[in-house]
Amino acid sequence: MKTYYEQDANVGLLQGKTVAVIGYGSQGHAQAQNLRDSGVEVVVGVRPGKSFEVAKADGFEVMSVSEAVRTAQVVQMLLPDEQQAHVYKAEVEENLREGQMLLFSHGFNIHFGQINPPSYVDVAMVAPKSPGHLVRRVFQEGNGVPALVAVHQDATGTALHVALAYAKGVGCTRAGVIETTFQEETETDLFGEQAVLCGGVTALVKAGFETLTEGGYRPEIAYFECLHELKLIVDLMYEGGLTNMRHSISDTAEFGDYVTGSRIVTDETKKEMKRVLTEIQQGEFAKKWILENQAGRPTYNAMKKAEQNHQLEKVGEELREMMSWIHAPKELVKK
């Protein structure tokens, strides 16, 4: 595994160049501000709206996506996956010039062929492995978050060096930047989200909650045991792996972990995980998601509404009113 650090990157390669950050959401605001603090010239390309005003208030020169691409030598695409292909076709593609770099923080659109850059531009990825607010906060504290770097197309012969310069400007070489490929980053990211981090965990939490409530236990108690305490366990794993978590819990809980875990996540579960991975690798999920967006998201919207109306959510909303240390915004925001 090749990992790059501060001494392996030269942010000076971006001096005299302009970086266009396309999009000013979670990653956009963090990467743009970190780059600026590293002495890099940054412009923000967004359409008129809330993000336009926020970027302007943050002191950036804000312009249309087309103008930003024409202005910059490095173009970082930080729009949501489902918007990138359309914006690329409408405003980016015709404005690309020989020798420019097209950057991404997720490989979805390149790997699944939704964006096909011309052969005369570099195509690379710098993917911080943390949400935007953490990328920014840790940078301001003098540190950085780990990231992945990949080169899809090296038209100039310097693509990796420029990508590492960008990673250093964002602060990621302070922690370490691991070399990967667009394929590996995309497929593992989608699998992790679907099978473990989002799909797997939410299904497990709901199943546990429903098992307890159907067994006659009060929903409030079920919520505490199946969702609320999950953060305590995840934090222990996050800080020191499974061993640290097991060292920190009671022996009763640890024994229950050993004898029961494999009854919940069975060999059949793992077989299904492999089927999910195959669907991702073969592009079936990507096709499904692209078609879902083209159709106006009927399935997505219906499932989202049903999930939001689950008893677990209603009970949780009430119980969190008891928790003074939780400062959740009334309006949901992407971090």
UniProtKB/Swiss-Prot annotation:
Function: Involved in the biosynthesis of branched-chain amino acids (BCAA). Catalyzes an alkyl-migration followed by a ketol-acid reduction of (S)-2-acetolactate (S2AL) to yield (R)-2,3-dihydroxy-isovalerate. In the isomerase reaction, S2AL is rearranged via a Mg-dependent methyl migration to produce 3-hydroxy-3-methyl-2-ketobutyrate (HMKB). In the reductase reaction, this 2-ketoacid undergoes a metal-dependent reduction by NADPH to yield (R)-2,3-dihydroxy-isovalerate.
Segments forming a coiled coil: none
Organism, scientific name: Bacillus anthracis
Ranges where the KARI C-terminal knotted domain occurs: 181-326
Gene3D superfamilies: 6.10.240.10, NAD(P)-binding Rossmann-like Domain
Cofactor note: Binds 2 magnesium ions per subunit.
Gene Ontology biological-process entries: isoleucine biosynthetic process; L-valine biosynthetic process
The encoding gene: ilvC2
Start and end residues of each KARI N-terminal Rossmann domain: 1-180
Full protein name: Ketol-acid reductoisomerase (NADP(+)) 2
Phosphoprotein recorded as keyword: no
